[in-house]
Regions:
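Short amphipathic alpha-helices in soluble, non-transmembrane regions
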Residues: 25, 61-62, 94-97, 175, ...
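Core segments of cupin and vicinal oxygen chelate
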Residues: 12-55, 99, 107-119, 162-208, ...
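Vicinal oxygen chelate
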Residues: 5-14, 35, 66-165, 183-211, 250-324, ...
């Protein structure tokens, strides 16, 4: 019963068309599922990932057109990263970001890896991290039809940063699900405590969480450009049910078992209020669509299929068809 690393991140957008264009045409990720938020079917839920949307490669977005801008603060997932294969790939991305007008930093080193910090069009704080020296959870396989050459393509999710007021509480929750402390690095803001690097299972960039203590910030307000939750990988339904018992014994309120069709989940908030999810690796995104046309049409799980007509009527048009 082991957490294996990061499964996916789910963030917020107010512009589903602009989001689709940036993540597919600029970052070169594959849209592997166009579906809806199962808790609010008036909103799209887009999944981007590697060629097949393997667990550990998925960056997802809920679309809420009227949502305000995210306000940075504590109790937030304040930084998300995407893995690329090599230091050479970072050089390619600097040129690509310049070409496409993406706000970005020079290549630098952070927590033992070379990295480029950048923002998406709605201000989400992202980075590209090089897997040049990575040891641990392996990455995925870039889609061969991406506009980005496969040798430079994004291969998965890298370390995430949690910004909190009481780091010991978040660290305790991470330890409960199997994380251990790897290292501490100096704070990015003068006068703040060191950032604690936590890892799980095989470790490496696909299994790392960075806990940033900040005593100088107000609580976050979630909006476009913000991250809603992080999910961690587990093997199957049996393990998920066992984790529900662990959380119950620890006195952590949780959702219990949730059927998401493409995977199974449970949700809980760690003591600083950040939403965590445990999600199974399967069944996967090719359960209801052929591999060749993943993400090209609106996919609905069987328990929403009888509502398709009304759901489609309430969604904004979004053309994601590639095989024309």
């Amino acid at each position: 019963m082991n957490v294996k690393g990061i499964h996916h991140l789910s963030a917020m957008t107010g512009s589903v068309t602009g989001n689709f264009e940036f993540y597919t045409e600029v970052l070169g990720m594959r849209l592997i599922k166009k579906t809806v938020n199962q808790d609010d079917t008036s909103a799209y839920h887009l999944f981007y990932g590697d060629e097949r949307g393997n667990a550990g490669t998925e960056l997802t977005f809920f679309d809420f057109p009227s949502i305000g801008q995210n306000r940075k603060g504590v109790s937030s997932i304040s930084g998300s990263s995407l893995r690329v294969p090599s230091d050479e790939a970072l050089g390619f991305w600097v040129e690509r970001f310049i070409e496409h007008g993406v706000k970005h930093s020079p290549i630098s080193e952070f927590a033992g890896r070379n990295v480029i910090f950048f923002e998406d069009p709605e201000g989400q704080q992202l980075s590209l991290v090089s897997d040049e020296t990575n040891v641990g959870v392996v990455g995925g396989t870039p889609w061969e039809k991406s506009p980005v050459p496969t040798q430079y393509g994004i291969v998965g999710l890298g370390p995430i940063k949690l910004t909190v007021r009481k780091p010991e509480s978040t660290i305790a929750a991470l330890r409960l699900i199997g994380f251990t402390e790897k290292a501490r690095v100096p704070a990015l803001v003068e006068g703040q405590e060191d950032i604690i690097i936590m890892q799980v299972a095989e470790g490496g960039s696909g299994a790392e969480v960075q806990v940033e203590p900040r005593s100088d910030l107000s609580p976050t307000r979630l909006g476009k450009g913000g991250v809603h939750h992080v999910a961690f990988r587990i093997a199957d339904k049996e393990e998920l049910l066992a984790w529900i018992e662990v959380l119950n014994k620890a006195g952590l309120p949780n959702s219990g078992f949730v059927e998401r069709f493409y995977f199974r989940s449970l949700y809980f908030r760690e003591p600083n209020g950040i939403l965590f999810e445990l999600a199974t690796d399967g069944p996967g995104f090719d359960t209801d669509e052929p591999f060749e046309t993943l993400g090209e049409s609106l996919a609905l799980p069987p328990f929403l299929e009888d509502q398709r007509e009304s759901i489609e009527a309430n969604l904004r048009p979004l053309d994601t068809k590639r095989s024309k």
